[in-house]
Amino acid sequence: MEFDEIKNRLLAYFQEQGKTIAPGDNLFETDVIDSMGVIELVLFTEETLGVELDQAVMTKGNFETLERIAQTIQSASG
């Protein structure tokens, strides 16, 4: 899956929740996501994108920015 496609799907996911994200925003510091939000995002990733994230990649650093989340998903998609 292409990086831009993943990023756009993630943007749509957050927009559906009424969240606005600017490039490079720290999603934890801007209250876009919290620990429960990470779990919901992982479920979205598995159910909608068909990408299963290994528990080892579920670190705060991998979910801090939209770009980092997209990189994590792209790496996991093979």
What are these regions (language model features)?
Residues 37:
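Two-component histidine kinase catalytic core, primarily the HATPase_c
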Residues 1-20, 71-78:
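Thiotemplate assembly-line natural product biosynthesis machinery
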Residues 15-32, 51-59:
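Phosphopantetheine carrier-protein modules
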Residues 55-60, 66-76:
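C-terminal structural segments of small proteins and small subunits
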Residues 16, 64-65:
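Terminal leader/tail segments of proteins
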